[in-house]
Amino acid sequence: MSEVLRPSYVRQAFERLAVGRPTRLLVFIDDMDGLRKVPENIPNREGTSFHLGEPVSRIPDPFGDCHPSFSEHMLSLLGKFLAPVEIEYELIKSTEMYGSGAFDEALKLILARHQQIIEIIAPTLREENRAGLSPIMPVCPQCGQINSTLVTAYNPDRAMVEFSCERKFGGAHPCGFKGEQTVLGGKAKVGWKVDWALRWYALKVDYELYGKDLIDSARLSGQILKVLGGKPPIGFPFEMFLDEEGHKVSKSVGRGVTVDQWTRYAPIEVLKYFLLLNPRRARKLFLEAIPQYVDDYLDALRAYAAAAEEDRVSHPIDLVIQSTTPRRFDTELTFGMIMNLVSALGTSDRELIWNYLTGYDPKIASNPETERMGKVLMESALNFYADFIEPNKQRYLPQAAEREQLRALVEFLAANMGASAEEIEKKIYDLGRENYDKPGKIFPLLYRVLLGQERGPRLGAFIKLATPERMVEILNGSLES
């Protein structure tokens, strides 16, 4: 998704600066590429392995008969992923571009200048991989594979190549066919090192974003494009996403976060904002980190709403807001506080939770946009609690010395139901100083008893949110166990 969202931000910014200049956001689908490896996260891996080397647009859908091909199945998922983010884009399929002849003129040029292109690519390959190097990959008319073909002669005057189906590459199983074939009309495609240059030339691309692992590929593609007589687009390399262990997120093994998962635990605008910020810094992207990203977004949304109208257009939030997006959140409540409230109450009763939230800060229901955002966050918190917190929640049985500390807090709260968050926080610190060498050591005890977890929020504000009455109930329940 980042490969589509991030260029859309550049496009929006450009259109604001160059009013009236038409732009196109192209999403290119490499559905004519040969399958080199069976992904680990798909069904029917054995059946799919028989089609290694074939264009993915010709491989049966491993997920069943819901789509005519593997590529169409994945394309349907892309459409589903992009639907919630309100991006205007043009979908371009490799198979259609080659098959319709849209790439034919560029292919003729590549064929005519194949030797110059080979001389650019060859130094980037190991010596043993240079034999048979060709910018053109014919589709074998006998077995339908593309990874197995090896060009043996070029005939640019007739837009033809001679080739044999004998190369064992990327799992391909060559059939041994030998013959001559046109490179036009979908009968061939270019190799992956020439892909970008072909597209940039044929589609007149001005701007391209890519991961930092493709910096060398972009540089190489620019050199090839110059051979074709084109001008390389402006490039923008971005950093990779990391999982919670700091490893690069891999699509092939299914690591990462899907859009469906994200929207279960957070508004889609939070994802858009996350992808907008710091694209040249590696950032961790995993489900358990979402609550912090939500609060980062809410802070930015408050700043956006507080800005003068003429200044909002330059605020990052303005690029991610959608037609249905609340444009304000007039409360200091955080997603973390809402999640901790849900955890402490241990209920999915929406009305009860909402009453607690409005009781703590009536501003959450002060206007339709803030209220709508608040209820979206409440639903997200309930989902996150059910999936991540509740399954790991353990009831803590306090020791004798700890029980005395809890009784002291119960007595204070029972006698001071109207105490402020600051007064409650001070009492907790006083108890910490009385019982530990460092006052902060009391907090893990209270988090275990009140929330069933090791860490948590500032307790003064949280106890005010969840109400001293409810906290006394939980503390007494722990003391009676």
Predicted regions and their residues:
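Basic, alpha-helical terminal appendages of large translation-related enzymes
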Residues: 17, 24-26, 118, 126, ...
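A generic secondary-structure signal for well-formed alpha-helical elements
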Residues: 14-18, 82-89, 114-121, 147, ...
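Conserved aromatic-histidine-acidic binding/catalytic patches
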Residues: 2, 66-70, 94-98, 131, ...
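Active-site cores that bind ATP or allylic diphosphates and position pyrophosphate for catalysis
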Residues: 87-91, 95-253, 259
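Catalytic adenosine-cofactor/nucleotide-binding cores of aminoacyl-tRNA synthetases and other
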Residues: 213, 218, 228, 238-383, ...
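Residue-level signal for inorganic ion chemistry
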Residues: 110, 267, 446
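N-terminal Rossmann-like or analogous alpha/beta NTP/dinucleotide-binding catalytic cores
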Residues: 1-118, 221-222, 228
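Short amphipathic alpha-helical segments and their helix-coil junctions
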Residues: 89, 202, 304, 311-326, ...
